[in-house]
């Protein structure tokens, strides 16, 4: 037994040293420096060394002995800085060992690979000591980043896996969705940089079910010494629930790094195929180690993963995904075999042998090696292929769950986060911009893009077509468009967010008079300035919460501009009374079309289009409906207006209106659960009612409907905001106006067709309702009850002003002269008619 154990230790040490040498050989000087010095920086703690912080920071790695590189570093510190590192006290040191895991040292390691480091520590560290060690690791991450090396540390309590503890979703330890599978990956890929050897490798595979008993036997026989080994526990059976959660996690990762994740996703699928008795790959590698079969290029974990997936896909006769996984493997290794190299490293030898076995020709190698220059057609083909493979894995996962009557044990929060990211990335919805380049090619930019509009009544669908070439009709006719949509906004967004459209792209447009080149260029500049291409991935917290609008652009009059009709015309209007929503004598709305472009907290990009007289109302309702009342306000809201005339005024007015409505939507509280805003559009009054759960819109034909709607929609504490329309008032009303109070004036029409109502708010802004029918008394009662329910304050946006109850008056005629009396009271002294005409002369604006 002793000789057997010693032989195993020698093999284990030899494999470990081979992996260390390979990790260093594959990388540049900065990586080599970081990789070599990390154990030293964790073993010692000194103000002159990176990672230092005040406090009782745990330091010292069990059985640490500096190698030649580390001794040289320590000697330099002592020689040039006068520092003599103090060895930690003797005995059991706090850090059990330092290990890399993942692709490091394997054929899958590339020049851009990061480092995942497990810092395994004694379970007797208290919370404060663990926190200090975590802070030191964070400082070391920053130090490595300053050298251009990405390092991620994970503190691992040596008893963590025995107690089935899990981290939270978001790190490489991937939350509660993996446990045995995480340990499986660690055992098959770990490289010991310093500290104790890993005990699991010494236990034969046929003793796995009795792991703890076998280990205790080795200790009892004196073959192994307990404090010389890191013992994270055995690999118990894999539960269906854990497989389900781990597979979802791999799909989650595949969104951002598809080539890297496909291989792991298919490994999990292979495990499920063998369920309930899967051959975990770590056990496979250990069996080879015990048998002395150092195959697969030195038991390279990446090659063995490919070998297992190949066995599975061959067995189920799936050549399509087998070809894909081989290409993913080739691209991950990143050795361009079609290009000659002066020095042939071990990774190149491995890949050359595999490619020869696969029967690939030079044309395929050249195509794959040219991946950095792939453009949209190749990228979209690759994206669809990757998506098909991932969805096939997902379907197989669902079948697996049904077959095993699965009750998912992963926490509901983790599953919710995973499924929401899958939904955000893969769900195809109208108006949603599909992002087709998740790290497939670094540059999709096009030198030329042409937008062509096809009007209704033609052979092709009406709408917009995008081509990646200049508008030479021969080339356009002979090529399929890259993308089609009914609305230009969606095409521009698709081209921008997928990287085809850059500042260097030459734009062309055949817009049939709808959109010309200057307008297109202006829109592209606005969108590119407002929306950054790349943002950090959404956090698990964001994915667990309802999606919220983060960046919003409201694009006004891009495709239909009512002000274009003003060209070469004289238009009469009063600047003081100009209302862009009910403009001029005909009360036309100057907003003809609205396009929404927004990015939400799940990093989805969406577009919507509205046109016609009610575009503003519909767009407002849609925007506000996508904001739940507890949502954070958008980070930015921009209005881009492309009107030929009155552009600045329209933009400002829309910006004010949208900001006001967003504030009303998000500022209501449970104590003040509803708010109301009236808006006049194209001569019609619309009411927006802000309730706890939604925003409703109602057309208000007359005062009875207007205030009946208030009464019907109001809840306790309802506040009112009225968008008034400046109109010519009877002189008697104009003269009786008083700032600071709300005034209602009733006037009989004299033709038995109801009555008129003139309403003045505290600022004497007026709104008029003609030919109203119904009970004035009921109206007065409802309005009085409404205002009195608001207590003693009137809310106007976020500011407060003094509140007075409304005053009600009746306009009567005495001796042919109009006068004002309080409603339903005895007449008061006659008020002489105002002798001032407040109407200014009509102004003219000539548009050319």
Curated annotation (Swiss-Prot):
This is Adenylate cyclase. It is found in: Cytoplasm. Its main location: cytoplasm. Residues 541-848 are annotated as: Regulatory. Keywords: ATP-binding, cAMP biosynthesis, Cytoplasm, Lyase, Nucleotide-binding, Phosphoprotein. Belongs to the adenylyl cyclase class-1 family. The regulatory domain is involved in the regulation of cyclase activity by the carbon source. Activated by the PTS system, glucose-specific IIA component (CRR). GO terms for cellular component: cytoplasm. The modification Phosphohistidine is found at residue 609. It is an enzyme of class 4 (lyase). The lineage of its organism: Bacteria, Pseudomonadati, Pseudomonadota, Gammaproteobacteria, Enterobacterales. InterPro entries: Adenylate_cyclase_1, Adenylate_cyclase_1_CS, Adenylate_cyclase_1_N. The keyword ATP-binding applies. GO terms for biological process: cAMP biosynthetic process. Residues 1-535 are annotated as: Catalytic. GO terms for molecular function: adenylate cyclase activity; ATP binding. Its EC number is 4.6.1.1. It catalyses: ATP = 3',5'-cyclic AMP + diphosphate. The keyword DNA-binding does not apply. Transmembrane segments: none annotated.
């Amino acid at each position: 037994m002793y000789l057997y154990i010693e032989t195993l230790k020698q093999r284990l040490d030899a494999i470990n040293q081979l992996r260390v040498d390979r990790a260093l050989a594959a990388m540049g000087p900065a990586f080599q420096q970081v990789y070599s010095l990390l154990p030293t920086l964790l073993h010692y703690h000194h103000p002159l060394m990176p990672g230092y912080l005040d406090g009782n920071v745990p330091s010292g790695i069990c059985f640490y002995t500096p190698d030649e590189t580390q001794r040289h570093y320590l000697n330099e510190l002592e020689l040039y800085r006068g520092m003599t590192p103090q060895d930690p006290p003797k005995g059991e040191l706090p850090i059990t060992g330092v290990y890399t895991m993942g692709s490091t040292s394997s054929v899958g390691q590339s020049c851009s690979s990061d480092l995942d480091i497990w810092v395994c520590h004694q379970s007797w560290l208290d919370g404060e000591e663990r926190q200090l060690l975590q802070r030191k690791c964070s400082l070391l991450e920053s130090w490595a980043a300053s050298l251009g090396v990405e390092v991620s540390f994970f503190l691992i309590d040596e008893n963590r896996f025995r107690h089935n503890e899990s981290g939270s979703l978001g790190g490489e330890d991937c939350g509660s969705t993996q446990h045995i599978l995480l340990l499986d990956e660690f055992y098959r890929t770990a490289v010991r940089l310093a500290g104790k050897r890993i005990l699991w490798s010494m236990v034969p595979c046929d003793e796995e079910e009795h792991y703890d008993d076998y280990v205790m036997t080795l200790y009892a026989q004196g073959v192994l010494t307990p404090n010389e080994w890191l013992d994270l526990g055995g690999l118990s059976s894999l539960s269906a629930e854990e497989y389900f959660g781990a597979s979802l996690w791999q799909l989650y990762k595949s969104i951002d790094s598809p080539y890297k994740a496909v291989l792991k996703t298919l490994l999990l699928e292979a495990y499920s195929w063998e369920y309930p008795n899967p051959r975990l790959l770590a056990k496979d590698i250990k069996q080879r180690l015990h048998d002395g079969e150092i195959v697969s290029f030195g038991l390279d974990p990446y090659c063995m993963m490919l070998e297992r997936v190949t066995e599975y896909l061959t067995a189920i006769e799936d050549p399509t995904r087998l070809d894909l996984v081989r290409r993913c493997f080739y691209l991950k290794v990143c050795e361009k075999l079609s290009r000659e190299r002066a020095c042939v490293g071990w990774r190149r030898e491995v890949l050359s042998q595999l490619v020869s076995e696969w029967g690939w020709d030079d044309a395929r190698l050249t195509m794959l090696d040219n991946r950095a220059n792939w453009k949209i057609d190749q990228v979209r083909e690759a994206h669809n292929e990757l998506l098909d493979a991932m969805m096939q894995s997902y379907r197989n996962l669902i079948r697996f769950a049904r077959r095993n009557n699965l009750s998912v044990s992963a926490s509901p929060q983790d599953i919710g986060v995973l499924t929401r990211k899958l939904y955000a990335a893969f769900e195809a919805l109208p108006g949603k911009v599909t992002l087709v380049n998740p790290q497939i090619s670094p540059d999709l930019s096009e030198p030329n893009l042409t937008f062509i509009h096809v009007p209704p009544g033609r052979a092709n669908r009406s709408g917009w077509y995008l081509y990646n070439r200049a508008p030479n009709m021969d080339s356009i006719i002979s090529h399929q468009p890259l993308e089609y949509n009914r609305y230009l906004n969606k095409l521009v967004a698709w081209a921008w967010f997928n990287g085809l459209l850059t500042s260097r792209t030459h734009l062309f447009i055949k817009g049939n008079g709808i959109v010309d080149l200057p307008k297109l260029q202006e829109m592209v500049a606005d969108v590119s300035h407002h929306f950054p291409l790349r943002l950090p991935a959404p956090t698990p917290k964001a994915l667990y919460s309802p999606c919220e609008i983060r960046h919003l652009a409201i694009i006004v009059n891009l495709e239909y501009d009512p002000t274009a009709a003003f060209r070469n015309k004289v238009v009469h209007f009063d600047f003081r009374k100009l209302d862009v929503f009910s403009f001029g004598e005909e009360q036309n709305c100057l907003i003809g079309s609205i396009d929404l472009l927004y990015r939400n907290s799940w990093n989805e990009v969406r577009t919507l289009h509205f046109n016609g007289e009610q575009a503003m109302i519909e767009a407002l309702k849609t925007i506000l409906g996508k904001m739940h009342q507890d949502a954070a306000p958008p980070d930015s809201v921009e209005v881009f207006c492309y009107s030929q005339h009155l552009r600045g005024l329209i933009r400002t007015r829309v910006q004010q209106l949208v900001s006001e409505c967003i504030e009303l939507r998000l500022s209501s509280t449970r104590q003040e659960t509803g708010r109301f805003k009236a808006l006049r559009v194209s001569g019609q009054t619309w009411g927006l009612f802000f309730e706890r759960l939604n925003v409703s819109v109602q057309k208000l034909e007359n005062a009875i409907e207007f205030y009946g709607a208030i009464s019907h929609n109001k809840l306790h504490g309802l506040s009112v905001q009225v968008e008034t329309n400046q109109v010519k008032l009877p002189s008697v009303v104009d003269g009786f106006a008083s700032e600071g109070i709300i005034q209602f004036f009733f006037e009989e029409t004299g033709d038995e067709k109801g009555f008129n109502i003139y309403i003045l708010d505290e600022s004497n802004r007026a709104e008029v309702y003609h030919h109203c029918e119904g009970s004035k008394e009921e109206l007065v009662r409802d309005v009085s009850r409404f205002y009195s329910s608001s207590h003693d304050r009137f809310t106007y946006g976020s500011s407060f002003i003094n509140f007075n109850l409304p005053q009600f008056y009746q306009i009567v005629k005495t001796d042919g002269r109009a006068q004002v009396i309080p409603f339903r009271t005895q007449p008061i002294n006659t008020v002489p008619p105002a002798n001032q005409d407040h109407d200014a002369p009509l102004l003219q604006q000539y548009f050319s």
